Amino acid sequence: MNSHAQIGIIGLGAMGQGLALNIAEKGYRISVFNRHLDGVEENVAQDFMAKTEHRETMGGFDELDSFVQSLAAPRKILLLVSAGAAVDEVIENLTPFLKAGDLIIDGGNSHYRDTERRLQDLETMNIDYLGAGISGGPDGSRQGPAIMVGGTGYKKVSDLLCSITAQDSSGKACCSYIGAGGAGHYVKMVHNGIEYAEMQLLAE
């Protein structure tokens, strides 16, 4: 990839890989990052790049500084890591490389109060933060998920997010800005509660 990427993804699990391919197929330049842990997660980004057909518009990294440098300003970075301490760890490691006006998007199932805490912390650095509930699982991430967004800086990434989602029966993108703070993750929490209740009813 010869020019700066329009978005970066951190975390190449099933959701991260599906969304990376989805974004690339919509014509965006993208950088992907996965940590390197000896004997646990080795060469994940490189292996993913070796399999993709989008090497001209996608770059793979296992070092955060080079990953961040590959992104066009203001940088837009989508986190797809496990909810909880892992998100805080990634943000702590990432922020030294960021500048005012950059945007972090948490695409995992974080608790909405954690999202609000992180947003407040990042506001002191003038870094925008979005909590984005992403529904559809690995298949949806690849073919078109539904996305529920809350926080600050949505306009910086709204066109991209709306381009990768599913569409409703009227052709409208299944991507909505819910509101400030942790609103996006709050709605995703309610969504998951309804889904799991329905699954329990079917099981019974």
Question: Model-derived features: where do they sit?
Answer:
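NAD(P)+-binding Rossmann beta1-loop-alpha1 motif at the extreme N-terminus of oxidoreductases
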Residues: M1-R75, F97, G101, P138-S141
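A generic structural signal for short
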Residues: I7-I9, D106-G107, I194
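Glycine- and other small-residue-rich loops at beta-strand/loop junctions that grip anionic moieties
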Residues: L12, F33, L79-L80, G107-G108, ...
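Generic alpha-helical secondary structure signal
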Residues: E42-Q46, D62-D65, A85, T152-K155, ...
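Rossmann-fold NAD(P) dinucleotide-binding segment
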Residues: E63-Y129
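Rossmann-fold dinucleotide-binding core
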Residues: V87-I91, S110-E204
